[in-house]
């Protein structure tokens, strides 16, 4: 049976051809290799129509033009030559669209990304809607690739080389007004008249390309170009630490096209695309993409979720304010905040105001839309307005008695169906639910700070939590724009449990004489966004170390922090960035001043600050402990699968995405190699490095995680 076409042609009475894109059976349009013949058949018909005046590409999907190429198509390539051939096929198709003798216009609404934008760039003009859902970008770098269907050659010539480099190197997505300002689109119109506006543009002569700004014209010349590529190359190397080969290839390919002409540029683009598709970095990044897509589809349990019409939040602090923001402004649900202090409510409301006002200033949001979203948030110092809330998120201090009191108050003041979700980072959910009248409706919902930026949430059912409570909480997390993983109710849950030994080891190396900046730089070089010492300063030393005694009590001395170090730091009133002094010193708030290591930290903890370890040795000690603990979590079913373990580490603590997560990384090294490294470290530094039993067994049998445990472990 022949597959229905994703592209349909309709020639209007005014001789404008409208090509409608609608991939059968899919929510979003993505480009597949088999579509090439469909488009070529349409191009043949268009060339044969001598009365044709213009062509418009438009999507039939409600909220996307084309979201990019189908990633499976790339994953199915076995060799660089196959992936290169795929790119050349895409380039050829775009060239045929561009070569049509009449004006070709892309009518864009919703996501126009990757191959979708490359198709739009091959058109002679572009019109897009002013809808917030409309975004344009080339995000291939986030998958360890580069645009392979002409994007590296067409975009710099259209909007200028420096602007194009920023878009392609970062995967940055532009809104409609930004795209218009840069000359990426020719017009921005309301959704209701998109087709009419595109048709009118198609009836005119081909839109002439806008002259580039003087700065861009200078940078396109040989001298300006040499300076620009040297400067951008240096900046990119600093940012990526050489861990992402795609960025260097992007620079090379764009420079080749500008220096040697488009023919050489297209050739270099296809070749680089093929080679990058086979790199371990791209394979790891694509695996993360597939895994996160699966997690977003996972309902969490077999039960249907309960309806969610409104949410309550207990506590207006930093976490409460952030949770209120994502609930109202991302999930679109009415939120009522309860705090014993009116200032707490004001703080939470200001948090959302600041976030939304920033969007208004950047012209990402209309003032009227800001006001509409803010109107969803209200506050109270008692339980008025809580009677019919479907789910209450508790975000008060980490105190068990206080949280148990909150459960009792919610059960007394809210409906019988109301779910109680605790944003605890360390307390057992079973203990919080211990005196509950309806323990089946008590669950953990652990957000990470800052709430609006961190994509992960941990959902923690205790043994008595109902399947419907799990499903409803997962549903809320997804509405809030989060990636949820369901984890077992054991001390530290998953993310904090694998993070604690990593940070502990960094502190231990400090006491041995390694310098703060050397430890942090070593882990940044390894691929983490910030080093462990800086991370502790950012989170707050008091907050970040609170969980260590909990973990030590649960799992023994492998979680013990170096004796007296943490207490010495806290007794010296060092909390990190929030009070201006931690391991680093911070300038006055509001002033841009570079943080500096406080030299007083070394005598305070009885260290010399004269280290002997190389950067790889520092990274090895921190990372190996994290890997070992992740495997223990899988063994104890703290995480349901290796998929959740990799996603949790990448999205929760910034484990290097190009390594694919702890389990993919162990697979790439081989369990035998990991065990050998850990045994060597155990001999040198102590029993905390002893590899767990599962790793040793896998090493003996030559097993890997993703080939043996790719499905959920219940």
Curated annotation (Swiss-Prot):
EC number: 4.2.1.17, 5.1.2.3, 1.1.1.35
Keyword Lyase: yes
Subcellular localization(s) per the UniProt record: Cytoplasm
Pathway(s) per entry: Lipid metabolism; fatty acid beta-oxidation
InterPro entries found in the cross-reference section: 3-OHacyl-CoA_DH_CS, 3-OHacyl-CoA_DH_NAD-bd, 3HC_DH_C, 6-PGluconate_DH-like_C_sf, ClpP/crotonase-like_dom_sf, Enoyl-CoA_hydra/iso, FA_oxidation_alpha_subunit, FadJ
Transmembrane stretches, start-end: none
Site feature: Important for catalytic activity: 118, 140
Alphabetically ordered keywords of this record: Cytoplasm, Fatty acid metabolism, Isomerase, Lipid degradation, Lipid metabolism, Lyase, Multifunctional enzyme, NAD, Oxidoreductase
Cellular component annotations (GO), alphabetically ordered: cytoplasm
Major place of residence: cytoplasm
UniProt region (Enoyl-CoA hydratase), positions on chain: 1-190
Reactions catalysed: a (3S)-3-hydroxyacyl-CoA = a (2E)-enoyl-CoA + H2O; a 4-saturated-(3S)-3-hydroxyacyl-CoA = a (3E)-enoyl-CoA + H2O; a (3S)-3-hydroxyacyl-CoA + NAD(+) = a 3-oxoacyl-CoA + NADH + H(+); (3S)-3-hydroxybutanoyl-CoA = (3R)-3-hydroxybutanoyl-CoA
SUPFAM superfamilies for this protein: 6-phosphogluconate dehydrogenase C-terminal domain-like, ClpP/crotonase, NAD(P)-binding Rossmann-fold domains
Family affiliation: In the N-terminal section; belongs to the enoyl-CoA hydratase/isomerase family.
UniProt function note: Catalyzes the formation of a hydroxyacyl-CoA by addition of water on enoyl-CoA. Also exhibits 3-hydroxyacyl-CoA epimerase and 3-hydroxyacyl-CoA dehydrogenase activities.
Subunit relationships: Heterotetramer of two alpha chains (FadJ) and two beta chains (FadI).
Name this polypeptide is given: Fatty acid oxidation complex subunit alpha
Lineage of the organism: Bacteria, Pseudomonadati, Pseudomonadota, Gammaproteobacteria, Enterobacterales
Gene symbol of the encoding locus: fadJ
């Amino acid at each position: 049976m022949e597959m229905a076409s994703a592209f349909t042609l309709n020639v209007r009475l005014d001789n404008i051809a409208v090509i409608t894109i609608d991939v059968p059976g899919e929510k979003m349009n993505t480009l597949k290799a088999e579509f090439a013949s469909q488009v070529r058949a349409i191009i043949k018909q268009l060339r044969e129509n001598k009365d044709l005046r213009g062509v418009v590409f438009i999507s039939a999907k409600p909220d996307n033009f084309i979201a990019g190429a189908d990633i499976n198509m790339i994953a199915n390539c076995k060799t660089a030559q196959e992936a290169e051939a795929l790119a050349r096929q895409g380039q050829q198709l775009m060239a045929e669209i561009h070569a049509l003798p009449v004006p070709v216009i892309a009518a864009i609404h919703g996501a126009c990304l990757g191959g979708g934008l490359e198709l739009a760039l091959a058109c002679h003009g572009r019109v897009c809607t002013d809808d917030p859902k409309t975004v344009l970008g080339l995000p291939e770098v986030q998958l360890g690739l580069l645009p392979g269907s002409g994007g590296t050659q067409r975009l710099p010539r259209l909007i200028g080389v420096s602007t194009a480099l920023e878009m392609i190197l970062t995967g940055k997505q532009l809104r409609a007004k930004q795209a218009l300002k840069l000359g990426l689109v020719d017009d921005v119109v309301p959704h209701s008249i998109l087709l009419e506006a595109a048709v009118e543009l198609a009836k005119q002569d081909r839109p002439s390309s806008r002259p580039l700004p003087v700065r861009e014209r200078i940078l396109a010349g040989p001298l300006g170009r040499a300076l620009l590529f040297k400067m951008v190359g240096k900046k990119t190397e600093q940012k990526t630490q050489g861990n992402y080969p795609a960025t260097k290839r992007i620079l090379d390919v764009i420079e080749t096209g500008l220096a040697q002409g488009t023919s050489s540029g297209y050739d270099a683009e296809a070749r680089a695309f093929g080679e990058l598709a086979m790199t371990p970095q791209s394979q790891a990044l694509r695996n993360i993409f597939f895994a996160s897509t699966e997690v977003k589809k996972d309902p969490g349990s077999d039960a249907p979720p309960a309806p969610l019409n409104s949410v309550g939040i207990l506590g207006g602090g930093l976490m409460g304010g952030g949770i209120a923001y994502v609930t109202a402004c991302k999930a679109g649900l009415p939120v009522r905040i309860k705090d014993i202090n009116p200032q707490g409510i004001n703080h939470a409301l200001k948090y959302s105001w600041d976030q939304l006002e920033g969007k208004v200033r950047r012209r990402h949001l209309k003032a009227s839309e800001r006001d509409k979203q803010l109107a969803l948030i209200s506050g109270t110092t008692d339980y008025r307005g809580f009677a019919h809330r479907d789910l209450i998120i508790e975000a008060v201090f980490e105190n068990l008695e206080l949280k148990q009191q909150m459960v009792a108050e919610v059960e007394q003041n809210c409906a019988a169906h109301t779910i109680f979700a605790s944003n605890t980072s360390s307390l057992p959910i079973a203990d919080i639910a211990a005196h509950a009248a309806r323990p089946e409706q008590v669950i953990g919902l652990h957000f990470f700070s800052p709430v609006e930026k961190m994509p992960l949430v941990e959902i923690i059912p205790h043994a008595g939590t109902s399947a419907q409570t799990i499903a409803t909480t997962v549903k809320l997390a997804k509405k809030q724009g989060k990636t949820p993983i369901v984890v077992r109710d054991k001390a530290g849950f998953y993310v904090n449990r694998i993070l604690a030994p990593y940070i502990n080891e960094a502190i231990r190396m400090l006491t041995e004489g390694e310098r703060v900046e050397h430890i942090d730089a070593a882990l940044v070089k390894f691929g983490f966004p910030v080093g462990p010492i800086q991370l502790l300063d950012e989170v707050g030393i008091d907050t970040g170390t609170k969980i260590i005694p909990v973990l030590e009590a649960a799992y023994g001395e492998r979680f013990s922090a170096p004796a007296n170090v943490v207490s010495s730091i806290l007794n010296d009133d060092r909390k990190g960035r929030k009070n201006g002094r931690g391991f680093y010193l911070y300038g006055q708030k509001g002033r841009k001043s570079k943080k500096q290591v406080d030299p007083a930290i070394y005598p305070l903890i009885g260290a010399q600050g004269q280290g002997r370890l190389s950067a790889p040795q520092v990274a090895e000690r921190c990372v190996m402990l994290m890997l070992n603990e992740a495997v223990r979590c899988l063994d104890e079913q703290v995480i349901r699968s290796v998929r959740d373990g990799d996603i949790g580490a990448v999205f929760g603590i910034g484990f290097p995405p190009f390594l694919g997560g702890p389990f993919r990384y162990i697979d790439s090294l081989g369990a035998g190699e990991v065990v050998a490294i850990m045994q060597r470290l155990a001999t040198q530094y102590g029993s905390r490095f002893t590899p767990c039993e599962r790793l040793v067994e896998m090493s003996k049998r030559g097993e890997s995680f993703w080939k043996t445990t790719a499905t959920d472990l219940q």
